[in-house]
């Protein structure tokens, strides 16, 4: 089957839905694809299709993520929907880093809930630059004052985490009614699409920087070879170019023999795109999630670094007790978690939840890193901190 070439005529933007469980993230995702496919072409995705997100295994923990695509008048969007279970957080850390903007779904019937707060916080930590709010289930609230109250609460919460709460577009709608084809609610989906076009700037893509792709998944395609998938963090990779596989194991070189996106073949992959990369002569078992593909000589694996870390408070879902030197949590880099131990500054005995701290981390195996790389700290299945690499030591 020959694959058609991917159309690049519209700017390409990555977005996703975030918010509390059962507030309607998946229903909204389905409504967006359904309403926009009527106006601008493309494929409508049913709730069930999106809800049955393919399972992705990450170190024995199953994560589900659904990718859909749609067009607005001006742009092409790739949209990720994360199911709202307890492991959502892990998905935020690996997945929300893939968002140029997020649609925060808040049910007007409930207002902001604990996961609403947690997702905003994580959006801040993992670098989601813009948030738009879809106030869902407005068909079930007759009281205008109540809607205004919920809006105010959401704006305050966003402001609390350094998003411009006062200026963020809030669209009042009903995903379910839009999905059922009621025009007044369908128009709200169009309003949301217009807000995405207006409010989320076309990101300054890092296409001029050296190529780097964090590997999310690896599989072999019989007769063709090994394919790795992920979102290109920066640069451009052309078919035929040499790349290095960096991190976890010894660095190796290979050649890119194919690039594809949404099952369409490309001559090259560019920063910001979710792609599959076909590698020449590389065995499935030689490569794993958590490594990166990079332009040769541009990034090195390291195990020891200085970092600035924010430790989540108990209220934010963090630890209830302090930790001390020798603490050994997991450090999440891009798509992987690595155990590491910490050293605290000389005069500091312990770190309290809610503190900011400068710490030196030593990982048990090397990760491709440079200054400015962000990470999360996790233990026992929950996020307890977020940080950034300030200086590479070894």
UniProtKB/Swiss-Prot annotation:
Region labeled G2 — which residues? 60-64
InterPro entries xref list: EF-Tu_GTP-bd, EF-Tu_GTPase, EFTu-like_2, EFTU_2, G_TR_CS, P-loop_NTPase, Small_GTP-bd, T_Tr_GTP-bd_dom
Task: Give the span(s) annotated as G4.
Answer: 136-139
Catalytic activity, reaction form: GTP + H2O = GDP + phosphate + H(+)
Give the binding site residues for Mg(2+): 26
Q: Where is this region: G1?
A: 19-26
What Enzyme Commission number(s) appear in the record?
A: 3.6.5.3
What UniProt keywords are attached to this protein's entry?
Answer: Cytoplasm, Elongation factor, GTP-binding, Hydrolase, Magnesium, Metal-binding, Nucleotide-binding, Protein biosynthesis
Q: Where is this region: G5?
A: 174-176
Region G3: start and end of each range? 81-84
Oligomeric and partner information: Monomer.
What protein name applies here?
A: Elongation factor Tu
The root-end lineage is: Bacteria, Pseudomonadati, Pseudomonadota, Gammaproteobacteria, Enterobacterales
Gene designation per UniProt:
tuf
């Amino acid at each position: 089957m020959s694959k058609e070439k991917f159309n690049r005529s519209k700017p390409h933007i990555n977005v996703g839905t975030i918010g509390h469980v059962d507030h309607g993230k998946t229903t909204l995702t389905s409504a967006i694809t359904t309403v926009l496919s009527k106006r601008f072409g493309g494929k409508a995705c049913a709730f069930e299709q999106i809800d049955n997100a393919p399972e992705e295994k990450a170190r024995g923990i199953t994560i589900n993520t659904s990718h859909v695509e749609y067009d607005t008048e001006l742009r092409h969007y790739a949209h990720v929907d994360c199911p709202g279970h307890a492991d959502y957080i892990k998905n935020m850390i690996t997945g929300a880093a893939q968002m140029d903007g997020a649609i925060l779904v808040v049910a007007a019937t409930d207002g902001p809930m604990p996961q609403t707060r947690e997702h905003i916080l994580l959006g801040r930590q993992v670098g989601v630059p813009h948030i738009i709010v879809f106030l869902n289930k407005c068909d079930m609230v007759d009281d205008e004052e109540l809607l205004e109250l919920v809006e105010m609460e959401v704006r305050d919460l966003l402001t609390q985490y350094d998003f411009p709460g006062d200026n963020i577009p809030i669209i009042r709608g009903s995903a379910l009614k839009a999905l059922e084809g009621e025009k007044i609610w369908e128009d709200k989906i169009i309003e949301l699409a217009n807000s995405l076009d207006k409010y989320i700037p076309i990101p300054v893509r890092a296409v001029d920087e050296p190529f780097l792709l964090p590997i999310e998944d690896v599989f072999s395609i019989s007769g063709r070879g090994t394919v790795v998938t992920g979102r290109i963090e920066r640069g451009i990779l052309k078919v035929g170019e040499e790349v290095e596989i960096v991190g976890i194991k010894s660095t190796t070189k290979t050649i890119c023999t194919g690039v594809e996106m949404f099952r369409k073949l490309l001559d090259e992959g560019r920063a910001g795109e979710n792609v599959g990369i076909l590698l020449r002569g590389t065995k499935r078992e030689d490569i794993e999630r958590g490594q990166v593909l990079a332009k040769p000589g541009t990034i090195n694996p390291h195990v020891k670094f200085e970092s600035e870390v924010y430790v989540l408070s108990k209220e934010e879902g963090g630890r209830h007790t302090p930790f001390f030197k020798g603490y050994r949590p997991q450090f999440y880099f891009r798509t992987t978690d690595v155990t590491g131990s910490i050293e605290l500054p000389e005069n500091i005995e312990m770190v309290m939840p809610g503190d900011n701290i400068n710490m030196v981390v030593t990982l048990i195996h090397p990760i491709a890193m440079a200054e400015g790389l962000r990470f999360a700290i996790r233990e026992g299945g929950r996020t307890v901190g977020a940080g950034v690499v300030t200086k590479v030591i070894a």
